[in-house]
């Protein structure tokens, strides 16, 4: 007499009861697939946790002087590593220097002309 399981669960037959080799092969394939899915899910969750932890970490705020030095030497993400500046960046920096020096010379001559017109300086 068979014992009834609670909640109307049926008694499961064991895989060893089947003699068909194809069923055993299908079972192995299914087991391999589920293991592969589990390992992929673990990797995905680890990657997600890693990205979330990196996103949560606050990056240290650099002082203004350090940011200017990093810009000058072409250091983008590596703070302590000096990288050779590329040609485009060299041209941009050169043009910035020309612009700043031109502005300073213009301001100097502008103030000079203003003082000459006011009569403080003599020509």
UniProtKB/Swiss-Prot annotation:
The name on file for this protein is Uncharacterized protein MG055
Tell me the organism: Mycoplasma genitalium (strain ATCC 33530 / DSM 19775 / NCTC 10195 / G37) (Mycoplasmoides genitalium)
Q: List the disulfide bonds.
A: none
TM segments?
Answer: 91-111
InterPro entries attached to this UniProt entry: SecE_bac
An annotated GO cellular component of this protein is: membrane
Q: Does the keyword Transmembrane apply?
A: yes
- Renumbered to this chain, the Basic and acidic residues biased-composition regions fall at 31-57
At the top level, the lineage of the source is Bacteria
């Amino acid at each position: 007499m068979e014992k009834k399981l609670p909640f109307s669960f049926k008694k499961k037959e064991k895989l060893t009861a089947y003699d068909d080799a194809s069923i055993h092969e299908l079972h192995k394939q299914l087991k391999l697939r589920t293991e592969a899915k589990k390992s992929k899910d673990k990797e995905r969750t680890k990657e997600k946790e890693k990205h979330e932890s990196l996103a949560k970490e606050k990056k240290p705020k650099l002082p203004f002087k350090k940011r200017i030095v990093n810009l000058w030497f072409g250091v983008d993400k590596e703070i302590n590593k000096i990288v050779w500046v590329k040609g485009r960046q060299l041209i941009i920096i050169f043009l910035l220097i020309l612009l700043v020096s031109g502005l300073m010379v213009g301001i100097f001559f502008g103030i000079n002309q203003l003082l000459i017109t006011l009569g403080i300086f003599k020509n």
